[in-house]
Design a protein with these regions (language model features):
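Flavin-dependent oxidoreductase catalytic cores
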Residues: 1-305, 309-325, 333
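Rossmann-like dinucleotide-binding cores of NAD(P)H-dependent redox enzymes
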Residues: 324-347
Length: 347
């Protein structure tokens, strides 16, 4: 379907660095609390050092995933450079004393070996590498651990290009147990907080570089590309808020893009709680197959009393159905309770 409509399809090759079989055994034994503790906090507790033989076995499994993706018609594979791959690269987390630990060459050995083997086994597929960068958080503190500091990331980026990686995706490192590091809520990080890092990486390589991290408007995305900080913009939560973000921009309707407010309530919080993914600004998210705004049988004149959240949404849907809508609001501003909610700091 993607190819029939002129789109390319990519998947992410991801190893969560959990021992999935061990977790599955705990579930089958009815040890739910123990399994849940490991699932939520395994990155800080219950850590075992994977053997070199097990690492090679993991690469074989990832190779098999790439083969299956190729057979399914997938065009691009993104190697997720965080989690297991990132923890091996990390000077903070990796305390190994074998060929996979110590200096930068050893710590990145697994990642580079994986990339080389993928290029060999699926040579006609685009290989993107998600490059997680550890960023400073105050004095002698860091945000994210499962990645590389900028100086090492710059060296590693050039090595990835030399190994045949086609594109690099610059992102905030995670692996701290705090999803807010990589998916920051409103006010916790500046807009475009990874752009300065992608710019440095882009200056060192000749392959395309993408960046992600609180780039929420078409204008901000365009500015990043125009000033040479990246070639591609990565969107995450914004596509839950408005799946037509890119289409609206391509059609010249940037002003109609529904902007993500980074509240994390329907998306990140629900991921953490293993709940249904949703969006507080997009009631259709997750229900695209069943919730359709269809034209009304006849057009009517509709008066909406109050320009609060409910009134504005009712007006929007009514207008899309073909009705002639007039909104009446007694105050000088629309928004209702949102105006009060926006007053506290960081809102």
């Amino acid at each position: 379907v993607c190819h029939e409509n002129g789109a390319k399809l990519g998947i992410q090759l991801f190893h969560p660095d959990y021992n999935v079989k061990a977790l599955n055994d705990l579930f089958h034994q009815g040890k739910m609390q123990e399994a849940r503790a490991k699932l939520h906090h395994d990155m800080q507790h219950f850590v075992n050092e994977v053997t070199a033989e097990e690492l090679d076995e993991i690469i074989k499994h990832m190779e098999n995933c790439a083969i299956l993706a190729h057979e399914a018609g997938v065009d691009c594979i993104e190697v997720h450079g965080d989690r297991l791959v990132g923890s091996l690269c990390s000077p903070i987390l990796n305390h190994r004393t074998d060929e996979y630990g110590g200096d930068l060459a050893n710590r990145t050995r697994f990642a580079l070996t994986l990339v080389k083997r993928l290029k060999t086994i699926v040579p006609d597929m685009v290989i993107d590498y998600k490059l997680p960068i550890v960023t400073p958080l105050g004095e002698n503190s860091f945000r994210g651990k499962g990645g590389l500091p900028l100086d090492e990331a710059c060296i590693f980026a050039k090595e990835l290009e030399a190994c045949g990686v086609d594109t690099l995706h610059v992102a905030q490192a995670n692996h701290t147990g705090n999803m807010g590091d990589t998916i920051p809520a409103m006010g916790t990080q500046p807009y475009g907080f990874m752009v300065s890092y992608s710019k440095k990486i882009k200056e060192l390589v000749s392959i395309p570089v993408s960046v992600v991290g609180r780039i929420v408007t078409p204008e901000a995305a365009e500015a990043v590309i125009t000033n040479g900080s990246a070639d591609i913009i990565g969107l995450g939560r914004s596509l839950l808020t408005d799946p037509d973000f890119a289409n609206k921009c391509a059609d010249g309707h940037c002003c109609n893009v529904r902007t993500c407010m980074m509240c994390n309530k329907g998306c990140t919080d629900n991921i953490q709680n293993r709940a249904f993914l949703s969006c507080v600004l997009n009631a259709e998210n997750g229900y695209e197959a069943t919730r359709h705004i269809t034209p009304a049988a006849s057009s009517k004149k509709i008066a909406i009393i109050g320009a609060g959240i409910a009134g504005l949404e009712a007006a929007r849907v009514a207008a899309l159905r073909g009705h002639h809508v007039t909104i009446f609001e007694k105050s000088l501003q629309i928004g209702g309770q949102l105006l009060i909610a926006s007053v506290p700091p960081r809102k």
